[in-house]
Amino acid sequence: MAISGRCHCGRNAFEIDGQLPEKLTRCTCSLCSKRGHLYAYYPPAKFRVTQAESDAVYRWNTKTVANHFCSACGCDLYADSPAFKQDGSWDGKTRRIAVNARLIDDFEAADRPVTVVDGKHLW
């Protein structure tokens, strides 16, 4: 079963093969804290962009994470990211897609527990 989502203006949309994970993630790094993400993680093969009319990319610090956002309405869409472990380490090859769960159709934040990752001190 696939789930879908889109930005506020609808110019960018995506589909995911699968469901919302049991837990979502909130990172405390400077970028995620300011943007208010709740992330749902997926392997790249399970995620596809179905519309990208105003997709823009922001990279910072080590430039290893591509943060996609809508240049029209400003919604954060997803990040193509290393598959960081809880301690901040990475194997150098495995990637994941961190979807802003708030954009998933019919998403209810209260329905899922949230794990906090201490990105403020890890990277």
Model-based region annotation:
Residues 1-123:
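A short Gly-Trp-Pro
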